[in-house]
Design a protein with these regions (language model features):
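Eukaryotic helical DNA- and histone-tail-recognition domains of regulatory proteins
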Residues: 1-36, 62
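Surface polyanion/phosphate-binding segment centered on an Asp-His-Pro turn
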Residues: 101-239, 246-247, 687, 702, ...
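Surface-exposed loop/turn segments and immediately adjacent short secondary-structure elements
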Residues: 108-125, 129-136, 228, 235-443, ...
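Extended C-terminal regions of large enzymes
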Residues: 271, 278, 282, 739, ...
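Conserved pre-catalytic core of RNA-dependent polymerases
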Residues: 359-595, 599, 897, 934-954, ...
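Short, conserved micro-motifs composed of acidic
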Residues: 550, 561, 655-691
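Basic, alpha-helical interaction scaffolds
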Residues: 681-757, 775, 810-823
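Active-site metal-binding core of divalent-cation-utilizing nuclease and nuclease-like domains
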Residues: 920, 976-1019
Length: 1019
């Protein structure tokens, strides 16, 4: 059963009445039990022990908030002071009915100000407890604060603490360490007042193998027992007659006869049939219970952590037991990589050249962090992204606005005095994500580091300052798109690359390319080079000093969770490389590789993108972070570019991943094989005709293989849709999961891969087929509704065709806007003569319809349908509230199968006689009259509201349910009842009264009932 809040309030309040506010607990359990079953007679089967246990659970697990508990205490205290008859009599063991009724009708009657004061009191109490509990504790050892549902209550609690409590603890003399401590205690106080549990023991959160619940163990044990008994009887019937088996079979038959209320079995075949039926019952029950548990687990996980839910889908699809590396090998490999303080070559000639070249740059002034900087940075942070080792989420810094000005002040002081940086500031937790199925190799992991949120806020402010300096002085080259704001990233590079490859292929021009892959690029760049880069590009002195200091303090702990194994290493000092997971890291890393772009561009040895003699551009390379592709018109020139890249990489101590480096040589449309030998003797092999290279996510050779890539993407998309439909998500969550997990597989290819309308229509058709296969979409329901928003009566599935058209249009506009400032983009725009799906050379292409136009057109088309259009026509009438009509689609969490069935009813595609005869043209149906009343045609409208045979049964039951809802709402509003129960379980009492209100229940005909309901609603 489910304990409602009203029940919990009654138990807690009655307990206080009986014990006189816990001053006399003598024999209270029997009195509490009697009072409870008197108030809730339908729960008379609950034992005295169970009621006493529930009282303890209410207090221990805070089933009633602290505010509610204090409120009930005040009410009981006032009641005891004003009415002595509430005292428990000495010669009786139970409360009398008047006392029970007095408390049962006692409801909260505090005003808004009193409620606010109680909230503030509770917050202050929890805040003081947190200050006492966590004072003088290591910030890295404090317990984790769980994520909270973003509710009005949470915002109210946060605002109250921010306005009334924090100002008493934060002032101009507060240090950064103290500020961090106060924010943590504030987060703990708000979380606890919001009902969250904060475990003191951090070991409690280690990954444990999920054991089956008790009900599952009981059912499995019972099924195993039945199968064992069934097997023994089967063997006995087949002729096995050992003495042991005979005794066992006799015991089984005796047990079956003793536990039956029906006619006893007379032979062994009947006993076997009985066991077979029991086995079927229990196995089906186990299946149902597991589905229910999966449904609850899937939807809860989807609500709180979509990313983790999608990751579990990927893990479940592989069904492969992955073996992690040993803790020693994991620690050893990454320690060897990070703890070696390797220096770059400061005497390299190109460093002198780069230093001389950048003399034109205006030096960056010393930076001060302002409150505006803090607000702008924090507003762009995700509320509940994984926190660092200090366990404070972004939400608390965002909503504790009183701290922003003091945070800016402390950050400015920190930039000017880096030695004041707290020790925990630079400690990270690095989560190791496997790159492939070779999980035993510690090098096959991608390290993602979670740093303290307060550190990331500071580095985000610094990043904005540095990026503005780079923009003002035009420092970053346009060939690098890894950290460029407002760029299109990988897709922009792929479009430029596609134009180059297709122009070369169609015109049979010479093109020589090389793919360069760095081995552990982020993890191997020397700190000495990162420091010198800041000096070369004239970053402000205080930022440079601060970054130099914190680099010397970087350390992290590796965490690897695989299957049921969790590995945690000792802290590792970071003396080489840069964190992956910090907003400053991409920009800093791109600055470290920026001189290479200058060295390559000054050679003028690239490939010439031509439109005509006036519009052309020589391109030598494209960069996306550390993914480098070189272009040249001859093999000799390409070798020169490779030599420059090799020299630069060697000087900054970054190594090539030789296995992933390739060259390709096309002369007059024909392939040639020329390997490139590095100075160390290693070879970069040339690609042969059948070999492809995965560049930024797409396999390519002389060009992108559109057909094979499309087939791969379609297969992956449909596989993700299938994996989603196999889960137990609710209808709304199922559609959202398809839009956010499956559709992006295709979205990334829009603008790069040639998709025709036929391709996209077939994908949508396959999607609808899968929905139909899983009973989520009726095969004859309106397909238009699938792609309409839920607020308009649809289901919210993304229309892939419109999404494709919109992305193509947006990319075209982006390139056209860049032509004024970029010669590269201007040349690519003129050169793209249907080489890519954008067809940038053709400017007279109509844009797709806007979102509003698309919705309006679809609704009009839906209305014009002769059968499907009846429902929207009814909803569009003035007497119908269309918003309320469609609310259930947006707010109710119902099964996707139920949702699809309800929409099929609205679309009137249920197999009624009228539908079979007039829509299906079924010649076997000669009479379409109702099979119950035989008075008129059997349509959906007739079945749900006009059949005389259903009037006194189904219709009356439906109207009674409506009356129950109204009855309960009125009773709750006027404090006649305290417990809200589901309407289908609610049984109205004949008469309920208080001192000022009463409500009665009677049985009337349908017409009179409707009149009474109208009168109640009018009042």
């Amino acid at each position: 059963m489910k304990w409602g809040e009203g029940m919990n309030r009654f138990i807690f309040g009655t307990y206080l009445v009986i014990t006189k506010l816990e001053t006399d607990r003598t024999a209270y359990r029997g009195k509490l039990h009697h009072a409870f079953i008197t108030q809730y007679p339908h729960l008379a089967h609950l034992t005295e022990q169970r009621i006493a246990d529930q009282r303890r659970v209410i207090i221990k697990n805070t089933l009633l908030t602290l505010d509610t508990q204090e409120q009930i205490r005040h009410e009981i205290e006032a009641l005891l002071n004003t009415n002595n008859t509430l005292a428990v009599q000495d010669n009786t063991s139970v409360l009398n009915n008047s006392e029970i009724q007095t408390f049962a009708t006692l409801q909260p009657s505090i005003d808004t100000n009193n409620h606010t004061n109680q909230t503030l009191t509770s917050l202050q109490k929890e805040f003081d407890n947190a200050l006492l509990e966590f004072s003088n504790t290591d910030p890295t050892q404090r317990p984790r604060i769980p994520k909270q549902s973003h509710t009005t209550k949470l915002r109210t609690l946060s605002q109250t603490l921010n306005d009334h409590i924090l100002p008493n603890y934060i002032n101009d003399n507060t240090s950064l360490h103290q500020l961090h401590f106060v924010v943590y205690c504030g987060a703990v106080a708000v979380s606890r007042c919001n009902g969250a549990r904060i475990a003191i023991n951090k070991q409690q959160h280690t990954t444990k193998k999920r054991s089956p619940p008790a009900w599952e163990k009981r059912l499995i044990t019972r099924i195993d027992d039945i199968r064992r008994d069934l097997g023994r009887i089967t063997q006995y019937i087949q002729g096995t007659r050992s003495s042991k088996l005979t005794r066992q079979v006799q015991h089984i038959t005796t047990k079956l006869n003793n536990h039956t209320t029906r006619e006893q079995n007379t032979n062994y075949n009947e006993h076997r049939d009985t066991l077979t039926q029991k086995l079927s019952i229990y196995t089906n029950r186990l299946k149902r219970y597991r589905e229910t548990a999966d449904r609850k687990r899937h939807n809860t996980q989807f609500k709180h952590n979509e990313k983790l839910f999608y990751r579990s889908l990927t893990q479940n699809s592989t069904n492969e037991k992955l073996i992690p590396p040993s803790l020693h090998s994991l620690q050893q490999f990454w320690s060897d990589l990070w703890t070696k303080d390797i220096k770059h070559n400061p005497q390299a000639p190109w460093i002198t050249t780069e230093t001389t070249r950048t003399e034109y740059i205006t030096p960056m002034n010393n930076t001060n962090i302002t409150t505006t900087d803090i607000i702008q940075t924090i507003n762009h942070l995700h509320n509940w992204k994984s926190p660092g080792i200090d366990n404070i989420h972004n939400f608390w810094w965002k909503y504790f606005t009183y701290t922003h000005s003091y945070l800016a002040q402390q950050f400015t002081e920190l930039l000017n005095s880096p030695d004041r940086t707290p020790a925990f500031f630079t400690q990270g937790i690095t989560y190791m994500l496997p790159k492939d199925n070779n999980t035993q190799d510690p090098s096959k992991y991608r390290p993602i580091t979670c740093l303290p949120t307060i550190y990331k806020i500071l580095t985000s402010c610094i990043t904005n300052k540095i990026y503005q300096h780079c923009t003002d002085n035009n420092i970053l080259y346009e060939e690098q798109k890894g950290c460029t704001k407002y760029s299109r990233g990988c897709k922009e590079q792929l479009i430029i690359d596609s134009v180059i490859l297709e122009q070369s292929r169609h015109n049979k021009r010479n093109i020589h390319t090389a793919y360069i892959d760095y081995k552990k690029a982020f993890d191997s760049v020397p700190h000495s080079w990162l420091q010198q880069v800041l000096s070369i590009y004239k970053i402000s002195n205080n930022i440079t000093q601060f970054l130099n200091y914190i680099m010397s303090c970087w350390n992290t702990t590796l965490t690897l969770t695989l299957n049921d194994t969790k590995l945690i290493t000792d802290p590792i000092q970071i003396k080489r490389g840069i964190f992956q997971g910090d907003s400053l890291s991409p920009l800093w890393f791109c600055l470290a590789l920026n001189p290479l772009s200058y060295l390559l561009n000054t050679t003028n040895f690239g490939y010439n993108i031509k439109h005509n003699h006036e519009i052309h551009h020589n391109i030598t390379h494209l960069f996306y972070m550390d993914d480098l592709k070189l272009y040249s018109s001859t093999c000799i020139k390409l070798n020169h570019l490779l030599h420059i890249t090799e020299t630069f990489s060697r000087d900054i101590q970054m190594d090539f991943g030789i296995d992933k480096c390739k060259t390709q040589h096309i002369t007059a449309g024909k392939r040639q094989l020329f390997d490139y030998e590095l100075e160390q003797g290693n070879l970069i092999n040339s690609m042969d005709e059948n070999e492809t290279y995965k560049y930024l996510g797409f396999q390519q050779n002389t060009h992108i293989k559109h057909t094979s890539i499309k087939q791969t993407l379609i297969t992956q998309y449909l596989q993700r849709v299938r994996s989603i439909l196999k889960t137990k998500l609710h209808g709304r969550n199922t559609i959202k999961a398809i839009n956010t997990y499956a559709t992006p597989v295709l979205t990334y290819s829009f603008g790069i891969i040639r998709w025709t309308n036929t391709d996209l229509e077939q994908i949508q058709r396959n999607t609808r087929t899968l929905l139909t296969k899983h009973h989520i979409h009726h095969p004859h329901s309106s397909t238009i509704r699938l792609y309409l928003p839920r607020s308009e009566g649809g289901r919210g599935l993304t229309d892939i065709k419109i999404l494709h058209q919109t992305q193509i249009h947006n990319f075209r506009q982006y390139f056209y806007n860049k032509t004024d400032t970029s010669v590269l983009h201007k040349t690519v725009t003129y050169a793209d003569k249907s080489y890519t799906p954008l067809n940038l050379h053709e400017t007279n292409i109509l844009p797709p319809p806007s979102k509003l136009t698309y919705i309006t057109n679809n609704i009009q088309t839906w209305n014009q349908k002769p059968l499907h259009g009846r429902f929207p026509q009814e909803v569009s009438q003035d007497c119908v509230d269309s918003i309320a009509t469609h609310t259930w689609l947006s707010e109710c969490d119902i099964f996707p199968e139920t949702e699809g069935f309800m929409l099929a009813i609205q679309d009137q595609v249920i197999n009624t006689r009228n539908y079979k005869k007039h829509i299906h043209k079924d010649k076997t149906v000669t009479n379409d009259s109702c099979r119950l009343c035989s008075q008129t045609s059997e349509t959906i409208q007739h079945i749900i509201s006009a059949c005389t045979r259903l009037a006194q049964t189904e219709y009356k039951h439906r109207h009674d349910q409506v009356a129950k809802i109204i009855h309960q709402k009125l009773a709750l509003k006027h404090n006649l009842i305290t417990d809200k129960t589901p309407y289908y379980k609610y049984t109205p009492s004949y008469l309920k009264t208080t001192h000022t209100n009463y409500i009665g229940t009677g049985h009337y005909s349908q017409t009179k009932l409707s009149t009474i309901i109208d009168q109640i609603l009018h009042l």
